[in-house]
């Protein structure tokens, strides 16, 4: 029995050591994973191009319309009524008629400046869209990392139980063959060993899938990794829900996008109002042989007369869009405040539950496990009593882990709802 106990604890220590060594090569803290994510995530790289495209659109909006040149009244032959003119080039052009016109459109009512202002708001929108994508991806990545941490800790938990029961099963098999224990006792231990092994395999399969999910956020640096941070007793949040609501309204990129959309609608309305004023077209033309003057140079202006179309329909559309944006802002604010209200209640409830828990209970369970294993090896406990304790031990360990992880998940949700990291 004493040899069995020594062997069991050596295996437990060796298992823990091997587990640690296996993970050393790819150990990363969550903060390090985020740094890799920020530098190598392809979705973020692609979104940055939208900001550069918006810069190019601002440049385009600043440009004047090109002048128009037209050449007309060019005769390819002469008839009997043709008059003779001085040659254009050498002896060519004595009977050549020609008209050339150069026209430039001048936009009135500050249309060009108003379009530039709209494109600047589009650029701001592209920047906010990048921030919103970053906010969503960071939340997704952190959630995936937390789930991976849970699976890692469950793997350690079940791995230790597998080691215990495999050692016990081997010992009971030998003792059963020698007639020292019943076959039923041996089979009970063996079945528990198989059950824990199956559960461990399920957890490991889930962990591999979750590692792949985390790696997918890291671009070309995505690989199998082990998160070195552990899930201990979480630090409880400071601040009130009213403070969180104010922070969210100041920081949320999607809320800023809604506000920016209102500004864009206002800028579009100004453009539509400016369209009521017709543009001015200034022209200069040269006419050779087509007028009473042999070489005629003249100036001209042209503009539409706003008698029927004063852009009334488009102005109305822009006004309605502006009103719609106001309603969307109000609704978005209500949604943000409601989400924080409910999440705050869940956080408060779970925080109270965690505070009532004995801070040393986790360690006491581990000490109790060692004691129960030793007592069982020394035949002071029955199999039923031992397995009943093991089941209670696992249930409590998983419950503690899940409650702590749930609080951390709620903290990540609050960070997501506020739009910035909180202590």
Where are these regions (language model features)?
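Sec-dependent signal peptide recognition
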Residues: 2-9
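Hydrophobic h-region of N-terminal signal peptides that target proteins for export
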Residues: 9-19
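Bacterial Sec-pathway N-terminal export signals of envelope proteins
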Residues: 20-68, 72-74, 80, 145, ...
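A glycine-/polar-enriched beta->alpha junction
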Residues: 35-45, 52-67, 92, 100-117, ...
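Amphipathic alpha-helical coiled-coil segments
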Residues: 46-58, 133, 137-156, 174, ...
């Amino acid at each position: 029995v004493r040899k069995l106990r020594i062997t069991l604890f050596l295996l437990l220590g060796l298992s823990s050591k091997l587990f640690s060594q296996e993970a050393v090569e790819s150990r990363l803290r969550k903060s390090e994973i985020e740094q890799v994510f920020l530098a190598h995530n392809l979705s973020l790289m692609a979104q940055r191009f939208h900001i550069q495209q918006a810069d190019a659109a601002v440049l385009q909006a600043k440009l004047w319309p090109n002048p128009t040149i037209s050449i007309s009244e060019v005769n390819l032959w002469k008839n009997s009524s043709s008059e003779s003119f001085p040659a254009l080039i050498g002896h060519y052009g004595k009977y050549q008629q020609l008209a050339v016109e150069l026209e430039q459109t001048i936009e009135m009512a500050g249309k060009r400046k108003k379009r530039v202002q709209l494109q600047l708001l589009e650029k701001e929108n592209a920047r906010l869209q990048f921030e919103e994508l970053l906010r969503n991806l960071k939340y997704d990545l952190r959630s995936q990392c937390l789930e991976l941490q849970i699976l890692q800790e469950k793997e350690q938990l079940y791995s230790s139980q597998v080691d215990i029961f495999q050692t016990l099963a081997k010992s009971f098999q030998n003792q059963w063959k020698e007639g020292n224990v019943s076959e039923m006792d041996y089979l009970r231990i063996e079945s528990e060993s198989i059950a824990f092994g199956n559960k461990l395999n399920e957890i490991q399969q889930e962990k591999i899938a979750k590692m792949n999910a985390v790696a997918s956020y890291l671009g070309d640096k995505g690989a199998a990794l082990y998160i070195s941070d552990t899930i201990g007793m979480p630090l409880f949040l400071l601040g009130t829900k009213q403070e969180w609501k104010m922070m969210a309204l100041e920081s949320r990129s999607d809320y800023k996008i809604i506000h920016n959309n209102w500004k864009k609608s206002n800028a579009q309305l100004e453009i539509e109002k400016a369209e009521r004023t017709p543009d001015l077209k200034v022209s200069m033309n040269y006419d050779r042989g087509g007028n009473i003057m042999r070489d005629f140079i003249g100036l001209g202006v042209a503009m539409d007369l706003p008698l029927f179309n004063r852009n009334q329909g488009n102005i109305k559309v822009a006004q309605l869009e502006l009103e719609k944006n106001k309603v969307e802002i109000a609704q978005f604010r209500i949604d943000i405040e409601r989400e924080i209200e409910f999440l705050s209640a869940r956080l408060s409830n779970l925080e109270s539950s965690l505070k009532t828990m004995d801070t040393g209970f986790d360690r006491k369970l581990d000490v109790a496990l060692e004691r129960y294993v030793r007592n069982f090896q020394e035949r002071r406990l029955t199999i039923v009593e031992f397995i009943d304790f093991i089941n209670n031990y696992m249930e409590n360990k998983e419950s503690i882990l899940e409650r702590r992880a749930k609080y951390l998940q709620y903290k990540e949700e609050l960070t997501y709802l506020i739009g910035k990291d909180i202590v």
